[in-house]
Amino acid sequence: MNIQEFKQKYNYDVATKMMQQYLDIKFAHLDCLLLFRMGDFYEMFYDDAILASNVLGIALTKRGKNGEEEIAMCGVPYHALEHYLTKLIEANYKVAICDQLETPEDAKNRGGYKAVVTRDVTRIITPGTIIEENLIASAEPNYLASLVIPQNKETASICYVDLSTSEIFVVNVPEAEILNELARLKPREILVSENLRSSNLADSIFKQLNFRITYQVDSCFAINKCKKIILDFYKMKDIKGIGEISSSQICVIGSILEYLSLTQKQNIPHLPIPRIINFHSYMTIDFSTRHNLAIVINSQGSSNGSLLNTINHTVTKQGGRLLYNFLSSPLTNIAKINHRLNITEFFYSNLEIVQRIRELLKKTSDIERCLTRITMNRSSGCDLLSIKYTLEAATIIKGVFFDAYGFNLPDFIEKIIKPLAGDAELYHLIDESIRADVPNNLNDGGIIKHEYHPKVAQLHDLINNRKLHIEKLKDQYRKETGIDSLKISHNNVIGLFIDITAKNVNKILDPKFIHRQTTVNNVRYTTTELQKLESELVNAKTLVISLEKALYADICSQVIKKAAYLRMLASSLSVLDVFCNFAYIADEYDYVKPELTDDLSFDIVKGRHPVVEKVLQRESKSFVYNDCHLSELKRIWLITGPNMAGKSTFLRQNAIIAIIAQIGSFVPAKSAKIGVVDKIFSRIGAADDLIKGQSTFMAEMLETSAILAQSTKNSLIILDEVGRGTSTYDGVSIAWSVLEYIHDKLKCRCLFATHYHELTVMNNFLPALQNYTIAIEESGKDILFLHNIISGAADRSYGIHVAALAGLPASVINRAEQILLKFEKTSTGKGKNILSTESNNLRLFNLEHNQTTIRSKLEEQFRTIDPDQLSPKAALELIYELKKLA
């Protein structure tokens, strides 16, 4: 919509000046909900009002007419803005905050009584650019991402920034891994070029990952423009100052900096030079696997019942975020993993220190986000106090280490706690200047201690002792004049005045007493001294707030100079919190230090599922542990057994153990030896993807296809019931061929659970495959699931027993047992069908032999063909011959 169409739609020419001002600002922010400050309210008009009233659950009213059209309106109190912003941001809306830049009095002085108060947008709030503590989750990052896919489409670039903590990163990602990387980052908002709007990728980001996409015009990603933005922002002369970065990385960094500048109205915190991330330095976990394993959120989108929720006993917000990042990005470098494990082991061996540190960490604050608010002029005195208390606690924490170890700490611990020495100068600055009972709002005053600045003390003295100052002056004038009845009074016409009776006029001899007014019985005077006192009393509140703001800004500027140190301190405290947390859960839940190797070992003794175990503990039940022994020679376990017996739990627990080990934590097992896993893939559960119009089976096949395409020799695959969404013969055939492919081509570690007992014969010709099943006890018709994984193969699934447990009518259960008995009698053996009896002699349909024969005949035929000598008729005949060979 162009400006002419916009003005015509909203009857601009007949609108009031105030409404014209609103429309001018709205046209410049058509992609936003515009909150327009009017006195004590933020108002919304027209379509914005209709939409916001529904989202916020507030009344929709009208504000007169614009021409013949009634103007829809709704509003929220300015002091409750954050409450309503939370709802709008959670609903994925972009919000422009339009503030009054002057008071109504200023407007009158500028342009008379008809002047409209000057207003403009001071900030645009989007899901990816929030910094307010009440609007964002404290225990996870709040990323804004920018994505560029170069024309060659081989490698994409992603830049991601957490504005609330002033962290920025850039990574190159293979095109096939874009969705996996975005699933790892879980950004609140993604910037992409307009030319991707109709792409399959954008569709997948929105529908599969449910992330907000903000489309930007293509020019926002132009390399020359982005390069200039970067150089200007970091005050550099050469782009090499960023490091060795690709053209697409320049584009994503530049585009994200420009977006921050536009939304924050140039008020961007200092961002460090982007940290270049190596995509291969952490484990790849695709979106489906993250969902299936409930790593950071459960299937309902909540953290309850997730792995993160189970092992997160951190005591600080920044520690919680670091643990979130650890879990989202397990390492793949053995040296780095072992470094983390050594730190965990140190704290596990010093649990008394851990207990003391955790108590002290509770006294620290989220100074990363405090510092960002300070640098963006959106802080309160509470942020400064948070820094002060954190500095104090940090110094004590360092003392705890010194008391226990003196100067004999391991180097890797010494490096972590080095920033804890504190900054005495900064601590004393805040301690001496900021009141302990500081209000949240700077406009309320009462931030600065009276003794910090003499003028502050003087003004507060005036405010708090108004009557005393007037009484003091009254006593002085009584002595000077000898008039004992002299009073100092006040009215709204002449303000403060000296009041004497008419008979005492002849005693007023000093010319400093200036006549103001005579009444029937009294005469009123003033003095320069009294006028000054009155002016000070009238202006004291305004003056003290103004002075306190200036002093506060100066103190903040001193804090900003220490930003680099404070960020190091925040990092140190978060690292301490995470590793003390690892030691705590290792002790609390009996976890063990894993051994990491560079082979295909996966040797878990008495492994447990941490989430399920915790749930059972609350119910006073015990978790049944299980072993898992995979190696290069025996790398596939084919697991059969009844439903509800624990197959899926076993699959998940081993994937989770690998993840926990590679973040540097001890693991829930008696012992664990794990060859580093580069990628984990899972195919568990069944659900129709109704949004995409995909059936359960299609969704399953797409996931399985992606797993087979992306896995490497060092990957860990867990598959549950592949092929169950179609007919039995189709399902068995697919499951069989998938197992063959994993065994022969990928040669990676795999746990494969199935109800297709026909597959259990595959160990006869797949040497790396072993059969395992779930132990049960049968007593007549009663069955007890023991949940133990044992060597061997199941010959039935006990599905009817599970159906009975689910409460199906007895008549249905009895009939099902009759039908099952008939099927078993007509089969070639209990629990087997024709596929399994024939499979000892051939790998399913002898595909490999047939394919080789066909291929050799086709190759021989192709060698005899000379394309340049073929006529159209001969070419057609040749096609028919080739078809016969196939």
Curated annotation (Swiss-Prot):
Keywords: ATP-binding, DNA damage, DNA repair, DNA-binding, Nucleotide-binding. SMART domains: MUTSac, MUTSd. It comes from the Bacteria. CDD domains: ABC_MutS1. One of its GO terms (molecular function) is ATP binding. One of its GO terms (biological process) is mismatch repair. InterPro entries: DNA_mismatch_repair_MutS, DNA_mismatch_repair_MutS-lik_N, DNA_mismatch_repair_MutS/MSH, DNA_mismatch_repair_MutS_C, DNA_mismatch_repair_MutS_clamp, DNA_mismatch_repair_MutS_core, DNA_mismatch_repair_MutS_N, DNA_mismatch_repair_MutS_sf. Pfam families: MutS_I (PF01624), MutS_II (PF05188), MutS_III (PF05192), MutS_IV (PF05190), MutS_V (PF00488). ATP binds at residues 641-648. NCBIfam families: mutS1 (TIGR01070), PRK05399.1 (NF003810). HAMAP family: MutS (MF_00096). Belongs to the DNA mismatch repair MutS family. This protein is involved in the repair of mismatches in DNA. It is possible that it carries out the mismatch recognition step. This protein has a weak ATPase activity. This is DNA mismatch repair protein MutS. It comes from Rickettsia akari (strain Hartford). The gene is mutS.
